[in-house]
Amino acid sequence: CSDERAGSTVDYACQRLTQYAQKYVNAAPESEQHLPILFNEYCTTWGLPSHENIKGILEAVKGKGLEYFVVDCGWFVEEGVHWSRSMGDYVPSDRLFPEGLGAVSDDIRKAGMKPGIWFEIDNAGPKSHVYSEREDLMLHRDGKVLTTKERRFFDMNNPDAIAYLTDKVIGQLRKYDFEYM
């Protein structure tokens, strides 16, 4: 591959392939020209976020060019219950966030990022109140609530379920000024 003719070296071939990739393969549509860079804290807290540990994480990631900082699952967990079994009520944990989620949102902004929060809005875990107390909001088949691996699913055709989720999700996004879900 050391032929001296123009265009016949391995370097030249690699350069041409790279130019092709830059022009055609990497060309994103207009809607994808600016996609935000976000940090999701899940792999640092493993579903046990708290205001205290988020402060430490913010200190470590601020100034790194991140646009959003997302608080993942567990922000609503009740003492002694795994987050996956308690989701659906979405009431912030006073134990983990004694100053409230608004204080976390403020701290994220002070670190130069926009706050985001995780919701899994389609289902409820068996330890949540909505799971057992609001079966009317869940999907039914043949008169029975559909349950899969201990999870129940909100009936998105039910106006009461939509109202419940709007209150829980949209209400908290607005209340605590979260910009990403």
Identify the residue ranges that each predicted region occupies.
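Active-site-adjacent "subsite" loops/lids of carbohydrate-active enzymes
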Residues: H34-P36, C43-G47, K114-F178
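Glycine-rich, aromatic-flanked loop segments that form ligand/cofactor-binding clefts
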Residues: G7-N26, L66-C73, F97-K149
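Soluble or luminal CAZymes and related metallo-dependent hydrolases
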Residues: N53, L96, G100, D160-L165
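An acidic-aromatic substrate-binding cleft motif
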Residues: A13-Y68, D72, V77
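Acidic-and-aromatic substrate-binding clefts and catalytic sites of carbohydrate-active enzymes
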Residues: W46-S50, D94-P98, A124
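Surface-exposed, active-site-proximal loop segments in enzymatic domains
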Residues: E79-S93
